[in-house]
Design a protein with these regions (language model features):
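Edge beta-strands of jelly-roll/beta-sandwich modules across compartments, strongly enriched
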Residues: 87-95
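Short beta-strand-to-coil "C-cap" segments at the C-terminal boundary of structured domains/repeats
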Residues: 51-52, 94-97
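Viral virion structural and adsorption modules
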Residues: 1-4, 96-97
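General beta-strand recognition
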Residues: 39, 47-49, 80, 92
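Surface-exposed ligand/attachment interfaces on beta-rich extracellular proteins
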Residues: 3-6, 10-34
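Noncatalytic modules at the cell exterior or secretory-pathway interfaces
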Residues: 35-38, 72-88
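Short, solvent-exposed S/T- and G/P-enriched segments that are highly enriched in secreted/extracellular
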Residues: 21-28, 58-72
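Short, surface-exposed beta-strand/strand-loop-strand elements in extracellular ectodomains
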Residues: 41-59
Length: 97
């Protein structure tokens, strides 16, 4: 089987951030990305929302436990996140080239 995955290059304009995900919405810092792409990895069920001053709720996009995803993203925005239910864990956010 051949691996056709393209390697991910971290965008030097934004230092990757790791945050604790809990039962209250929290935000990343402002994310600068030249490619318009961000990579998000979570260790717990987490809901996420993008925007200039977002607040995440349990109605927003759900990322399941131990999931990694790449999203199109508007440079200059932030990512809000909140845990799903009583669990807690971490979210890692990286801008990619």
């Amino acid at each position: 089987m051949t691996n056709t995955t393209t390697p991910t290059t971290i965008d030097n304009d934004f230092a990757p951030e790791t945050h604790t995900v809990g039962n209250a919405s929290a935000q990343s810092s402002v994310i600068t990305t030249g490619s318009g792409l961000v990579r998000i990895a979570v260790t717990t069920h987490a809901h996420i929302k993008f925007g200039s001053n977002p607040t995440a709720t349990e109605e927003d996009l759900l990322m399941p436990t131990d999931h990694v995803e790449v999203f199109r993203f508007k440079s200059g925005d932030k990512i809000a996140f909140i845990g799903h239910g009583a669990g807690s864990g971490e979210i890692n956010i990286s801008a990619i080239d």
